[in-house]
């Protein structure tokens, strides 16, 4: 996923990945992480997701990162959140009482924000890992591990389908890929795996033969 691709999607508002409500899987499974209310939760590639509002409503402090400036601006505007904006290193830091978003490249985030990141005890990834083609996905997974302190727990959602039948994003991520490429840094527990083909018209129209959605609990080793 090149930055230009992402910016073009937001400029054209071609954001089919954005949900107009909180993700039901987040509502269903978040409590299984058993986090204290005041835990800091890291949300990578957050877009303008309403899931951040849900996490804040649970009493968490949300620390997020998003490449596109329009996405971040729309999040605060559409949710009527008074916020401040300041330049911090290579990033712009948008902040309100419980939700802080660093706008910029996630791969340089630790250079800007190591102090705040060190306070993280949880993370949530609904559409970040699956946004990357396989050639770039491992680099993202390694960066996530780099940003997350040892002992942190997270909820991660994937889609798995025959990649040859449809071009991503979202890209297919299998359970085998998870175990092989993230198992060194995370303890991995799959909480659920459901057939969701009939719920996704784009995949049906493209005659994709199967589509499953999985929810994982990840615990950072170390």
Curated annotation (Swiss-Prot):
GO terms for molecular function: thiopurine S-methyltransferase activity. It is found in: Cytoplasm. InterPro entries: SAM-dependent_MTases_sf, Thiopur_S-MeTfrase_Se/Te_detox, Thiopurine_S-MeTrfase, TPMT. Its main location: cytoplasm. S-adenosyl-L-methionine binds at residues 10, 45, 66, 126. One of its GO terms (cellular component) is cytoplasm. GO terms for biological process: methylation; response to metal ion. Keywords: Cytoplasm, Methyltransferase, S-adenosyl-L-methionine, Transferase. It comes from the Bacteria. SUPFAM superfamilies: S-adenosyl-L-methionine-dependent methyltransferases. It catalyses: S-adenosyl-L-methionine + a thiopurine = S-adenosyl-L-homocysteine + a thiopurine S-methylether. Pfam families: TPMT (PF05724). Its EC number is 2.1.1.67. Belongs to the class I-like SAM-binding methyltransferase superfamily. TPMT family. This is Thiopurine S-methyltransferase. It comes from Shewanella piezotolerans (strain WP3 / JCM 13877). The lineage of its organism: Bacteria, Pseudomonadati, Pseudomonadota, Gammaproteobacteria, Alteromonadales.
């Amino acid at each position: 996923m090149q930055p230009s691709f992402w910016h073009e999607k937001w400029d054209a508002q071609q954001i089919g990945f954005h949900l107009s409500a909180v993700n039901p899987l987040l509502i269903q499974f978040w409590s299984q992480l058993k986090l204290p209310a005041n835990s800091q939760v890291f949300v990578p590639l957050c877009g303008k997701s309403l899931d951040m509002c849900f996490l804040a409503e649970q009493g968490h402090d949300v620390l997020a990162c998003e490449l596109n400036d329009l996405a971040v601006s729309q999040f605060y505007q559409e949710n009527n959140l008074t916020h401040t904006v300041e330049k911090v290193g290579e990033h712009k830091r948008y902040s309100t009482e419980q939700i802080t978003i660093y706008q910029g490249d996630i791969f340089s985030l630790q250079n800007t924000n190591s102090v705040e990141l060190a306070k993280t005890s949880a993370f949530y990834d609904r559409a970040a890992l699956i946004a990357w083609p396989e050639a770039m996905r491992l680099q993202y997974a390694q960066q996530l591990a780099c940003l997350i302190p040892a002992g942190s727990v997270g909820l991660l959602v994937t889609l798995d389908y025959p990649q040859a039948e449809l071009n991503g994003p979202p890209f297919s991520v299998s359970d085998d890929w998870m175990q092989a490429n993230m198992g060194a840094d995370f303890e991995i527990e799959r909480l659920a795996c459901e057939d969701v083909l009939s719920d996704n018209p784009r995949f049906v129209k493209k005659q994709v033969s199967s589509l499953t959605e999985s929810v994982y609990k990840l615990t950072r080793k170390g």
